[in-house]
Amino acid sequence: MIQHVIPVPPLCGGREILDTKASRPLGDAFPKEPLGSAFVAYQDDITKGFFRSLKLISIAGNMIYCLSDLLLQHRNDRASHIALIDGQHRLSYAELIRQTERCGVQLQAAGVQRGDHVAIYLQRSVESVVALFAVWSLGAVVVIINDVLKNRQVNYIIDHSEASFLITDNRLRTSLTECPLSPDRILIVDSGELAGEKFTPSRVIGADLALIIYTSGSTGMPKGIMLSHNNLISGARIVTDYLHLTRDEIIVSLLPFSFDYGLNQLLTALLIGGTLVIQRSLLPADICNTLNRERITGMGAVPMVWQQLAGDRSPFTKTQFPHLRYITNTGGRMPESITKLFRQTHPHVQIYLMFGLTEAFRSTFLPPDQVDVRPGSIGKAIPNVELLVLNERGELCKPGEEGELVHRGANIAIGYWRDPENTAQRFRPAPFQQGKGGQTEIAVYSGDYVKTDEEGFIYFIGRKDQMIKSHGMRVSPEEIEDCIFASRMVLHAVAFAVPFDEVRSTIVIALVPSDHKSFSQKELSLYCKANMPEYLRPDVVWQLESFPLTSSGKPDRVRLKEMYTEQNQKF
C-alpha cells in the first residue's frame, strides 16, 4: 500500500503498565467501572510533570493501553466485521490489521524508529488510517497534516514539528516544493503488494506522546498540540459513554483527521468495533445519499456543514433517514434556527451540541432532551471533567456572571510542541487544588468567556480576543450571527469589529446569501431593525461569494477581517 509503508502490533508487544507507587503490574485489585461490555480502571499517572488520570479500557477481555490496541482487540471476535468503508472499498478488521502490520514492516525498513516524528499528508482514506496505526504501533509520533493545506503551510509544519519522515501520495507530493526532508525520507503510498516479513511492534505505554496536531491557525501561526495515547483513548471512551454507542454503529466521517473530533470519530468507531464510512464530498445531496445507502447511525459536523444541509436547496430536511440515531455539532455554535428546523424535520434524531478546544478535546455536551429547553446552552461537563468559571480575580463566578472557562480532569494535552511560553500561559495549576499534596495538577485556561444558569448549564459568550464593544456593551460575535441566521436569508455569516475612530468600532457582518439573486441588503437591514437591539445591529453588510476556511472547515475569522481591512484601505 505504501512505498516505504505502514502497520500495527499484537497487543503492543505484551507490555505491562506499572503501578508507579508499588512498581507492580496493575491487577484485579484495581477498581473497575462497568460500561456495558467494557470497564475502565483508573490510575494516577505522572506525564512529563503533569498529573493525569489514566484510563485503561477493556473490550471483550482485551486491555487497551495504547492506540494500536484499538485495532488488535478485534483480531478474533470482529475479524470479519467491516471496519472501514471508503467508496467501493470495504475493509474488514482482519484486513485492516493485516495491511497495517504490512505497512509497519516497510516503515521499519525505511528506518522509522520509536520516538521519531512522522508526518502524514494524505486525504481521509483507508491509506491514511493504515498509516496512522502503523506509525503508532512502532512507538513513533504522528504529525497529521490536512490535505487541503498548501506548500507553505505543509513545509512549516514539517519543519516546526521536526518530522523525520513524510508519508504522502504522488498527487500531493508533486505539489510540494522546497520540502525540508530529503527524498529518501518521503514515503509514497502505492497499491502494490508487500513482502510478508514478520512485523515486530515497539513497546508503547499510554503516557507516550502519540500525536502532534496543529491548530487551524485562525488565531495566528498554528501551534502543535501534543497528545498522548492516554489522551486519545480517554477521549474516545468518554464520547462512547455519553453518546451511548454500541458496536452496531455505522458512523459517517465528514471531518478531516487533522481536526480533533474528526480523528475522535475514527478512534471511537474502532474502540467499539463499529464501522466508519469515509465521506469526502460535502455536497448535501451526496451526504444524504450516503446516509441512506450505508444506513448511517451517527453523523458529526461543524456549523458550516449544518448550514448547507439546512439550506432551501438541500434534500436533508426533505428526506427521511430511518437509521440515523444521532447527530453531533462541534467547532462552533449551531444556530438555534437550525436546531429547531432539524427537530421539526427529523424528530427521531437526537441532537448533541458539544463544545471543546483541542488542548482538552471536549469540555461540554448538551443532552438531546435539553436542546429545546435550554436554547443557546453548550451543556455541562463531559464525564470525568470539572469545569470552573472564574472572574479576573480567579474567583468562582456566580450564575449569570461572565468569566473564563477552566477545564480540569480528563483529556488535558501535554502542552504545545516547542512553545514553552504559550504552554505556561494556557496550561496552569488547577485552581483551588494547590497545597493538597502530591504533584501539581494542571488545568487548561481556555480563553473563552462563558456564564452559567442557576442549574449549572453553561452558555458560551465568546473568545476573549474576539469580543466586540458596541454602545458601551461587550457583545459576542456569535450573538450577532445567530440573529442574522434566524432571518433565513443567509447561508453563512461572520461578525467582527473594525475601528471607526479612537473610541468607537464598526460592526461588520460578512455573509454568503442563501440565494444571491433574491438577496436584498435592504430587506436584511429592515429585519435587523425589527428583530435586534441597536447595539447588536451590524453597521456594514459585506456580501461575499464564499468564505475563506481554516483547515478544519471553520470560517477563518482572522483572514476575513484582514480581507475587509485590505479592501477598504484602497479607498
Segment roles from a protein language model:
Residues K380-N384, E395-F432, V475:
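Conserved ATP/PPi-binding loop(s) of AMP-dependent carboxylate-activating enzymes
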Residues I233-I250, F257-G298, D312:
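Conserved AMP-binding/adenylation subdomain of ANL enzymes
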Residues I59-I64, L72, S80-S125, V129-F133, ...:
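Conserved AMP-binding/adenylate-forming core of the ANL superfamily
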Residues M532-K554:
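AMP-binding/adenylate-forming catalytic domain of the ANL superfamily
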Residues L166, L291, M299, G409, ...:
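AMP-binding/adenylate-forming catalytic core of the ANL superfamily
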Residues I296-A301, A310-R374, E386:
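Gly/Ser/Thr-rich phosphate-binding loop
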Residues S92-A94, A210-S234:
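Conserved AMP-binding A3 loop
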Residues S80, E197-Y214, G220-M221, H244-I250:
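Conserved pre-ATP/AMP-binding loop-to-beta segment of ANL
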